[in-house]
């Protein structure tokens, strides 16, 4: 399985870079996982609704340019479906079983995802109702993908 994670912004925090690198190393036994960063749109702290939409649209265009046409796209969104780790694992396994070998996860910037990206997505998932920094979400996602592969193969880790 080829898994791509498209995310907005450059990761600067060393502890997150190290954590993600560790999980990517572990994941290499199960899948090819790549992380693609697109530039975030510079914006002032306080934005009108129209300005927020404009920022999300610009970031969204950059995201969409990185998604392969044949990819199954999963957007991480606060309004997405919440799943247990076991459900997430089963769903990833089903994608592989039914020939969806290219899966792209999308993590938006601090303002979220554009409507165009959400429309391109095949599904939306949420890792809870908490708001997490999008940089931290990368680490959470790669850990959950790793956990999913361990669960599917019946390997110890997830308890």
UniProtKB/Swiss-Prot annotation:
It holds the Pfam family SPOUT_MTase. CDD domains: RlmH-like. It is found in: Cytoplasm. Keywords: Cytoplasm, Methyltransferase, rRNA processing, S-adenosyl-L-methionine, Transferase. One of its GO terms (molecular function) is rRNA (pseudouridine-N3-)-methyltransferase activity. It catalyses: pseudouridine(1915) in 23S rRNA + S-adenosyl-L-methionine = N(3)-methylpseudouridine(1915) in 23S rRNA + S-adenosyl-L-homocysteine + H(+). Its main location: cytoplasm. InterPro entries: Alpha/beta_knot_MTases, RlmH-like, tRNA_m1G_MTases_N. GO terms for cellular component: cytoplasm. Transmembrane segments: none annotated. Its EC number is 2.1.1.177. Coiled coil: none annotated. S-adenosyl-L-methionine binds at residues 76, 108, 127-132. Specifically methylates the pseudouridine at position 1915 (m3Psi1915) in 23S rRNA. Homodimer. PANTHER family: METHYLTRANSFERASE (PTHR33603), RIBOSOMAL RNA LARGE SUBUNIT METHYLTRANSFERASE H (PTHR33603:SF1). This is Ribosomal RNA large subunit methyltransferase H. It comes from Listeria monocytogenes serovar 1/2a (strain ATCC BAA-679 / EGD-e). The gene is rlmH.
